[in-house]
Amino acid sequence: MISRRQLLAAMASTPLVSMMGTGSAHALPNNDYKALVCVFLFGGNDGFNMLVPNDNAHYDEYAAARPDIALPQASLLPLSLNTGSDLTLGLHPSMTGIQNLFDSGKMIAIANSGVLIEPSTKAGLQDGTHAMPPFLFSHNSQQTEWQRGWSGSTTPLGWAGRLMDVLSSDTDTISPTFSLNGYAQLLNGSDHSANLIKASSLPKVNAVSNSLRRKSFDQVMSLSPLTAFGREFDRVKDDSISIRDQLATAIESVPEEAHFPDISLSHQLHTVARLIKSSDQLGHQKQIYFVGLGGFDTHANQLDTHTQLLSALSQSLAAFNQSMEASGLGDKVTTMTMSDFGRRLASNGAGTDHGWASNHLVMGGALNSGQLYGQWPSLILDGENDFNKGRMIPTTSVEQIGATIAKWMGVRTDDAMGYIFPNLANFSVQDLGFLK
């Protein structure tokens, strides 16, 4: 039997149409406010063509591993990061917006990260000493593993949902989690379901049309329910309409910003920005958002496709950061990338096949910036970090990244952190230190 929560989630996923005025001024979030924005790069982003070694020795190692798709060294956008060694790094040439964010201290990179159950070595994985995450290299499974944050389990909950189980207030009438990219297990909690919003479904029709639609809808919904299920649906419908109207009103209270480019990810982040700026109306002190960009399964024509995708990512993140900084919210909002997995170092010609570890980005005004986080691997094929055929073994786990963010969001006890990330105890370093 469908639950009340499932009904509410389904109703809340309908396009937002406000029947209320839009002229009220919005209030900025309170001083305790913090938000996490998760950007999922669907398909498996090639993080080693996004963040590339730039010194001669490490670049030669990189180019030897992937001669058909290596970026020209002269094209890389240089980064001034402390790597703890003679390694220097550069960005893909399409990411000038993100280069500027690195230069201004609003962006950091986490090297060679991915899904793990415990710290793992090549030898340990080969002889069974170290546990292998299930269904590696499978899109659906690894998207779930990243979002679940508890590799090896079958829980339907996500780590961000569990985080909000700990942090959200019992008085919240609207869930503090939002997906702008459809269903996301990441946001599933024990106590709440995510609000599903389509950026393209924001109210665009005039007041008369809104009024006529609402009148017709009210007439249909006023019919008396004849069964217990009908009565339950009626209650859920009323809650859902109220939530929908509150969200639409909150979004509409914040003016649109012209600097967001006409890109799908940017549209999603534009809506996120408007919701964040109106969070005080919703009564939230903590919020989590999920957005996504697809197309990263680059088995062919990778150089051209990846250039377009990374340009879209760079432009969208730069616009979102500009919006947060202009509103004085830069240090209250942290944005992170996720992806199914990385790509194999060895190419299949003009593309790459499914890998394991990748490099990831974190953006915001609360960063301890200027250094590389995580451990840069050896890119030698069949070397110590190569599980097989150029699939890099992660040296930093999803749990370590998430726990660092959870601590910044306000998680203070070991019990709470253990509920959110049950595998975290397997890792000696549980706070990577990239947030203040």
Question: Where on the chain are the PLM-derived regions?
Answer:
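Metal-dependent active-site segment of extracytoplasmic phospho-/sulfohydrolases and closely related
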Residues: 323-349
